[in-house]
């Protein structure tokens, strides 16, 4: 267990960094382990690894760009005007591009993904959203 960080901040961060390293997977720490993991997935599944990597990184970064606009409008005075809505439209287009890239990497039909999502949400909520159903999930509801 870590001591109070104010006692010795350098020792605290050194200890925490050691902890982080201990609980991190080999592929996250070592390029050769990462290469082996990627090659194993590429060779033993139908997943297109480079395409999925591109999609995952792109979804995260483009989603962050969209969130940044919303944050600035809601919290920092950026106007909710046509220009910023157009900016979000473009970011949403980028998100769609990466989403379809993920579908292709996983050999999934994008329409089937949307239908599966609708089926999942209908099973969870029925006809309308409730806070309880969003918080208390049935077994197997991902």
What name fits each language-model region?
Residues 1-92, 96-142:
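Flexible "arm" and connector segments at domain edges
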């Amino acid at each position: 267990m870590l001591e109070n960080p104010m006692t010795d901040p350098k020792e605290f961060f050194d200890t925490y960094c050691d902890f982080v390293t201990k609980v991190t997977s080999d592929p996250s720490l070592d390029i050769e382990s990462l290469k082996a993991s990627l090659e194993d997935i590429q060779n033993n599944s139908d997943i297109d690894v480079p395409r999925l990597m591109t999609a995952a990184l792109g979804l995260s970064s483009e989603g962050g760009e969209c969130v940044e606009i919303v944050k600035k409008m809601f919290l920092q005075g950026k106007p909710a005007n046509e220009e910023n809505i157009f900016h979000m439209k473009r970011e949403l287009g980028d998100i769609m591009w990466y989403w379809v890239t993920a579908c292709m990497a996983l050999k999934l039909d994008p329409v089937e993904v949307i239908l599966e999502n609708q089926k999942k949400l209908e099973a969870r909520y029925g006809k309308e959203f409730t806070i309880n159903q969003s918080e208390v999930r049935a077994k197997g509801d991902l």
